[in-house]
Structure formats: structure tokens, C-alpha cells
Regions:
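Basic/polar N-terminal segments that are highly enriched at the extreme N-terminus
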Residues: 1-3
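N-terminal cofactor/phosphate-binding cores enriched in small/glycine residues
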Residues: 5-73, 87
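Fe-S ferredoxin-like electron-transfer domains
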Residues: 51-177
């Protein structure tokens, strides 16, 4: 029998298997916590670097990325208060500033747009990336089509290539311009 941990999630006492993340527990209970760098599929490990899944943990000064944080016994987690939702909204707004408008995007149905909708964000109040700095679609290789205008530098595609497909043919470059 596996070990369990009891904690409070949005006012409800829940029991989770040790090793599960807050995001996994919430998702299993039908709660939707926005996420971008985490893919809930076999072989994909969460990294927590996009910060789109932030939640508040009682007694902690900073918000926590729910996709990498494991609940502890007696922990009180809040996913839907003003602080957590405001932080997630801010993250999405900052990311949208570096992307082309949805109408000009190569992939109008991208997960990023779904998460923007979920957070109630249709546009960013931050300065847009200059048109000349938005990467073009690269379909120069017969086996890969790279759409960097949708890139938020979360590393999901690199992890998928390296850890799931085990071929390590893509990487990150030019971050932090």
C-alpha cells in the first residue's frame, strides 16, 4: 500500500499519494489550474519554469508552482484566490507580449491561447515584441516544423525531444535577448 498525505485544497480536506504534485491532485479532482510548461502525459516531467500554475500555500511568503510542488501533511493550498489568479494572469500577459496577435499567429489553436482564455487574458498591457523580432516559421527540414513565434522558452519541446523521444536534436539558444 502506498503512503498518503492529507492536506487542504481550496477549503476541502483531500488525501493524495505521496509523490503526487499539487497540480496532479487538483487535476484529479476536476480543478483546472492553468499550465504551460507541464504536459500531463507519460514520460513528461514537470519543470515549473513558466510559472503559469502558481498557487498560494498558507504560511509561505511566495507562491509555488503547483506542477512541481508536492503537498505536505497538513498543508493548506489555495488555487483560486486573488493573489494566485492575479499572478497567473500576469505571467500570461507577459508571455503574450512576446507573441504575435492571435489572428497573426501560425497556430491559433495553441495551448497558450487556451490558457490565456482560461485566465481571462485577451491582450497584454506590456509592450509588444517588435515585429522584426518575432521569429518566422521554419519548415526547412523535412522531419521537423519549428514554430518559434509560439515559443515561451519553457523548455517543454526540448524535454520532449530529449527525454520522451530520446533523440536530443533540439536545444535552446538566444534566451534573454
Amino acid at each position: 500500500m502506498s503512503e498518503t498525505v492529507k492536506f487542504t485544497l481550496d477549503g476541502e480536506q483531500v488525501v493524495a499519494e505521496k509523490g503526487m504534485t499539487i497540480w496532479e491532485v487538483a487535476n484529479g479532482r476536476g480543478l483546472v489550474i492553468p499550465h504551460l510548461c507541464h504536459k500531463p502525459a507519460p514520460g513528461y516531467r514537470p519543470d515549473g519554469n513558466c510559472r503559469a500554475c502558481m498557487v498560494e500555500i498558507e504560511g509561505e511568503r511566495t507562491l509555488a508552482a503547483s506542477c512541481i510542488r508536492e503537498p505536505q501533511e497538513g498543508m493548506v493550498v489555495v488555487t483560486n484566490n486573488a493573489r494566485a489568479t492575479s499572478a497567473r494572469k500576469m505571467v500570461v500577459e507577459m508571455l503574450l507580449a512576446d507573441l504575435p496577435e492571435r489572428e497573426k499567429s501560425h497556430d491559433k489553436s495553441a495551448h497558450m491561447w487556451d490558457m490565456a482564455d482560461l485566465n481571462g487574458v485577451s491582450e497584454s498591457r506590456f509592450p509588444k515584441l517588435e515585429e522584426g523580432h518575432i521569429p518566422l516559421l521554419d519548415d526547412s527540414h523535412v522531419a521537423m516544423r519549428v514554430n518559434l513565434d509560439a515559443c515561451i522558452s519553457c523548455g517543454l519541446c526540448v524535454r520532449a525531444c530529449r527525454e520522451v523521444q530520446v533523440n536530443d536534436v533540439i536545444g535552446m539558444a538566444g534566451r534573454g535577448r
